[in-house]
């Protein structure tokens, strides 16, 4: 049975995730005018595009909201963001830059916390401003139902009556004026913006065209680092981590993680750090483009990743990257709280993040131009004396040890050579073109692989005696 209502539930309370912009303002007024009982819920997620969240409920009541609440979600959002940071839950990379999934993080928090707040008020119908072409409609749908299985969804933008009457911004503003209602006549931008404490998203309109650069965007969390007229002073920043969590910046310890993130944003923002231009695959597998800001997350990530690489071995890091990428896609799809995501999160935080303790100092200049100055911690597996090119008194191994290690490699090198010879003997259209003409080997005469593992000292022995000599005296292996 569908949970989506396609017509206005007259006489019933309808919760609206209310931003105070034109779209949600007219939606509240229109629903009240048509006989529904709108109730507005505004999430305080530290958004940088709304300087006065506390004043939003008063505006909502002007448009007819029976209940108008601000719900502080900053602490929960910061915690989820720190979990994503620890897990490397970032799967989108374009032009050499990472997208830190800041919008999906915000949706995971608002989609659950707001629905819980509505349910406390006896509101079990929810609407928001997401369109049918985007990701948010599915993210909110999933999180909403997980938080309240009784929830039904009503979105004015999926209601033919609403769309027919108020299909565009001009019609919306005219409708409010004709009904004697105010609205914020903000200047029309060349793109749309959505923000929270972790980052800002700029998309749509002119940014849909790939011949329009990132530089048309006016940053709201940072500076125009590409503009030579903007003066940016070089700055050294030290970030301290304990068990995978950032705890201090420049020696100042933060008891409140929200304050730490705000300070990280301020530091990274004044250098233009963490701004990226991404082409991504939406949940429905259609490609879209967004310009993102995440100065604090970028600062925390580059220092966390540096420390992690100094601690964990190659296979752990490889598993971390694979699992983190998968987790990032789950987060993007609105599955951050699903069992498959929780399994990955718990594993990564337990076995990788829990030992990431230490400090990294980075010298920030403009944008992504920075230098790592110092890395230290109590559990680093980086020990320069083990591989020093200078003479050391406590070297971990010597020349003879390395000769033995190289000799053991003969086994798999011989196997690889045998396979290459086999491929080279295949018809041209199967193997020879690739192996002989597509690599550096040239011709590969058969039989070379046997020479790799030959032992001159046992060449005179019969085959059976040689096998006996190589066998274990007891047991099997």
UniProtKB/Swiss-Prot annotation:
Catalysed reactions, as listed in the record: L-citrulline + L-aspartate + ATP = 2-(N(omega)-L-arginino)succinate + AMP + diphosphate + H(+)
Record-annotated membrane-spanning stretches: none
Residue numbers binding L-aspartate: 131, 135-136
Cellular component, GO annotation: cytoplasm
PROSITE patterns xrefs: ARGININOSUCCIN_SYN_1 (PS00564), ARGININOSUCCIN_SYN_2 (PS00565)
UniProt keyword terms in alphabetical order: Amino-acid biosynthesis, Arginine biosynthesis, ATP-binding, Cytoplasm, Ligase, Nucleotide-binding
Keyword Cytoplasm annotated: yes
Pathway note: Amino-acid biosynthesis; L-arginine biosynthesis; L-arginine from L-ornithine and carbamoyl phosphate: step 2/3
Predominant location: cytoplasm
Binding residue positions for ATP: 17-25, 43, 129, 131, 136, 194
Enzyme Commission designation: 6.3.4.5
Any GO BP annotation: urea cycle
Low complexity bias (residue ranges): 468-477
Location in or out of the cell: Cytoplasm
Residue span of region Disordered: 450-477
GO molecular function, one term: ATP binding
Binding site for L-citrulline: 99, 135, 139, 192, 201, 203, 280
Top enzyme class: ligase
HAMAP family: Arg_succ_synth_type2
Subunit structure: Homotetramer.
Protein family according to the UniProt entry: Belongs to the argininosuccinate synthase family. Type 2 subfamily.
Full protein name: Argininosuccinate synthase
Species of provenance: Nocardioides sp. (strain ATCC BAA-499 / JS614)
Gene behind this protein: argG
């Amino acid at each position: 049975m569908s949970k989506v209502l396609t017509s206005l539930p007259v006489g019933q309370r309808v919760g609206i995730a209310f931003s105070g912009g034109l779209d949600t303002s007219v939606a509240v007024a229109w629903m009240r005018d048509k006989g529904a009982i709108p109730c507005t819920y505004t999430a305080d997620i530290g958004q940088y595009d709304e300087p006065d969240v506390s004043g939003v409920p008063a505006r909502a009541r002007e448009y007819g909201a029976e209940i108008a609440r601000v719900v502080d979600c900053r602490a929960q959002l910061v915690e989820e963001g720190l979990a994503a940071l620890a897990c490397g839950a970032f799967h989108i990379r374009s032009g050499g830059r990472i997208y830190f999934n800041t919008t999906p993080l915000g949706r995971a928090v608002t989609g659950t916390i707001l629905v819980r707040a509505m349910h406390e008020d006896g509101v079990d119908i929810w609407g928001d401003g997401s369109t049918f072409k985007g990701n948010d409609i599915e993210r909110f749908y999933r999180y909403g139902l997980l938080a309240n299985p009784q929830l039904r969804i009503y979105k004015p933008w999926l209601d033919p009556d609403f769309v027919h009457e108020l299909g565009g911004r001009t019609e919306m503003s005219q409708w409010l004026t004709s009904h004697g209602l105010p609205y914020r006549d903000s200047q029309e931008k060349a793109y749309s913006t959505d923000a929270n404490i972790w980052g800002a998203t700029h998309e749509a309109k002119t940014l849909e065209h790939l011949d329009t650069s990132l530089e048309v965007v006016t940053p709201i969390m940072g500076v125009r680092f590409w503009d030579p007229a903007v003066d940016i002073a070089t700055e050294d920043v030290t970030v301290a981590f304990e068990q995978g969590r950032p705890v201090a910046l420049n020696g100042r310890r933060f008891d409140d993680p929200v304050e730490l993130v705000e300070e990280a944003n301020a530091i990274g923002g004044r250098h233009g750090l963490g701004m990226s231009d991404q082409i991504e695959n939406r949940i429905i597998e259609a490609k879209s483009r967004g310009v993102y800001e995440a100065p604090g997350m970028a600062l925390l990530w580059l220092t966390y990743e540096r420390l992690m690489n100094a601690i964990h071995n190659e296979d752990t890091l490889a598993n971390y990257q694979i699992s983190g990428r998968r987790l990032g896609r789950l987060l993007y799809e609105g599955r951050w709280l699903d069992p498959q995501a929780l399994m990955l999160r718990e594993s990564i935080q337990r076995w990788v993040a829990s030992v990431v303790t230490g400090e990294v100092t980075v010298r920030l200049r403009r944008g992504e131009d920075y230098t790592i100055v110092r890395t230290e911690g109590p559990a680093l597996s980086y020990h320069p004396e083990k591989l020093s090119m200078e003479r050391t008194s406590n070297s971990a191994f010597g020349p003879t040890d390395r000769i033995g290690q190289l000799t053991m490699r003969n086994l798999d090198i011989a196997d690889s050579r045998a396979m290459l010879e086999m491929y080279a003997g295949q018809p041209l259209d199967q193997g020879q073109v690739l192996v002989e003409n597509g690599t550096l080997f040239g011709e590969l005469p058969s039989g070379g692989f046997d020479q790799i593992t030959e032992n001159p000292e046992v060449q005179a022995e019969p085959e059976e005696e040689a096998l006996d000599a190589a066998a274990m005296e007891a047991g099997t292996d």
